[in-house]
Amino acid sequence: MKKATTSAAAKSQGNSKMQKNANNGTAKDKKKPNLDKESNDSNSVSDMLAVTKDQEVHAFFSKLFDDDAGPSTSKKTQSGSAAAAKTADRKRRLQAEADANNNDTGKAGKLTKESEATQGARATKRKQARSLGLERTSPIQVNGAALACPLVRKSLPPGEANSCPQPPKKDPAAVNSLVKIIKAEPTEEGNNNNDEKETETIETHKADSVEEGRRVLQWILFPVQTKVFFKDFWEHTACLVQRSNPKYFQSMISFKMLDEILIRHHLDFTVNVDVTTYKNGKRETLNPEGRALPPAVWGFYSDGCSIRLLNPSTYLIRLRQVCTVLQEFFHCKVGANLYLTPPNSQGFAPHYDDIEAFVIQVEGRKRWLLYEPPKKADQLARISSGNYDQEQLGKPIIDEVLSAGDVLYFPRGAVHQAITEEQQHSLHITLSVYQQQAYANLLETLMPMVLKKAVDRSVALRRGLPLHTFQVLGNAYKGNDCGSRKQLVENVQKLVTNYLMPSEDDIDEAVDQMAKKFQHEALPPIVLPSEEVRTVHGARSDADEQGNCVCDYKFNKKTSVRLLRANILRLVTESDGSVRIYHHVDNGLDYCKYEPYFMEILPEEAKAVELLISAYPFYLTIDQLPLESSARKIEVATALWEHGLLMTEKPFK
């Protein structure tokens, strides 16, 4: 292990692929699309997308707890733009369908009845043909600027949603509910308790990221307090909060913002976008190949299909901010999926998931039915289920309609399905947390480590099995009551008791490995303006008259520093004795896009990092770091700061 002689020498250690690419995890993520200016209507939506300035993000979150909703995100699409955005192929198809439906006299005798199977086959073929043709179609442009593709209206027949058989109409007597429904009074929206209001006065660069995450969760669940939520609902039962405020979540996403994303970014079917439907008791994914351009996506939507955006936080900076702040509180990856369902439709069959789900209703309405896990083994499930038939479900524990502004939480293993109403579409976000965060996951990491160490230490575990083992043990020999069988069983149990009890150090090591996994999965932090000037992101370099590089920052032993976030790094001692700092500062916006980022330090330098971890959220002077010399203290602090892990109390400028 090489000892760094200068701060610049303390470079990240990684695989050879990472070292070859100087821009790995940095330049690619920080590059922003060059968006053309359009009408005021488009600009108002662009402000909500990933190109939004950090100042607007900061302003948005500073208002979260004073105002129950953000500003209006878009204006109504003008009729002229709507007409211009429709393709000629779609006009011809819609006109042909209208003619076929209305011409009852001239063609009635010529038409023959088709079987349901034939109709379904033709419908599928028609969808595929249209989507394959439109996936290469560029958005219509006016004066060189692409227009937003409006929602194509299609008259859906009234009646049951497009799934068969459907759950019966809501019957309060049929609901086996122990779920508490919280209704927020309009006069109370946006109010928070006193300790939260006091926290708001803390300067951004002095705030505790874990507490900030709790406040965002409180905003989502209001008026349910977080302490009450974790006591009464978390991993136990569903919690439904109904509000009379459709604007509560509107600043996070809208239908028009989704359309802008499809136009301005390259999204592919299957990778970024799923098209799903649930008809005749069968769940189908209808993803074509290629890019998900608006005409293809809205064509599927008009045919009653649900649209799922798999990584909306990549493109929506406000949603990404919610996820990055919440991951500090939950100490795990916080995912987000976006679901857009047309009126009178259902996109997914009944199933359960392996995540704690927060359903945030942004637009429209959707009826949700939740059921108890079919088996006890499914409670707090670790793997998502397959699809259930309606006949396999018992009485719902909740049967309620979510309106815009409402939020529904339910734990892992809760079977659920959702259907839109006849005249209402639905746009909701599902935040997912605590996937693979159970004690079982810890033990799966811990026990192989314990066994390996025990085998190395104990010759008893390395001794060979008795020759007669296969003749006395096994399912076929359960009825054998011989003494040798009992002796072998006792020997195995004693070995487990004597050698496989994990020590405190073993548990620490296993938790470090799980935390290292979180560093690989986490979204990179969003550095706010007041933080940027205190971090490497605000540093600038220039050249003097001789061409030497001159940096605009310099540390001394009186400089005060702290970690950028509470969970920005993980100090891990690997099995070979090396000490590494794993972090997620340079992670990509796509899930595990790069190999894990880490920097290797000397074992004696670990104490300085441990002190920074324990001191958070407070600042320490560099002179307080427990290292032998001032030069070494400054060197270590500078290296951590240059990697984006530290923040100074005062800007250098």
UniProtKB/Swiss-Prot annotation:
Fe cation binds at residues 351, 353, 416. Belongs to the ROX family. NO66 subfamily. Residues 300-450 form the JmjC domain. One of its GO terms (molecular function) is histone H3K4me/H3K4me2/H3K4me3 demethylase activity. Pfam families: JmjC_2, RIOX1_C_WH. The keyword Transcription regulation applies. It comes from Drosophila melanogaster. Residues 1-12, 72-86 have a biased composition (Low complexity). Keywords: Chromatin regulator, Dioxygenase, Iron, Metal-binding, Nucleus, Oxidoreductase, Phosphoprotein, Repressor, Transcription, Transcription regulation. Residues 1-50, 65-137, 184-208 are annotated as: Disordered. Residues 194-208 have a biased composition (Basic and acidic residues). One of its GO terms (cellular component) is nucleus. The keyword Magnesium does not apply. Binds 1 Fe(2+) ion per subunit. It is found in: Nucleus. The modification Phosphothreonine is found at residue 137. Oxygenase that can act as both a histone lysine demethylase and a ribosomal histidine hydroxylase. Specifically demethylates 'Lys-4' (H3K4me) and 'Lys-36' (H3K36me) of histone H3, thereby playing a central role in histone code. This is Bifunctional lysine-specific demethylase and histidyl-hydroxylase NO66. Residues 13-26 have a biased composition (Polar residues). Its cofactor is Fe(2+). PANTHER family: MINA53 MYC INDUCED NUCLEAR ANTIGEN, RIBOSOMAL OXYGENASE 1. GO terms for biological process: behavioral response to ethanol; circadian behavior; negative regulation of DNA-templated transcription.
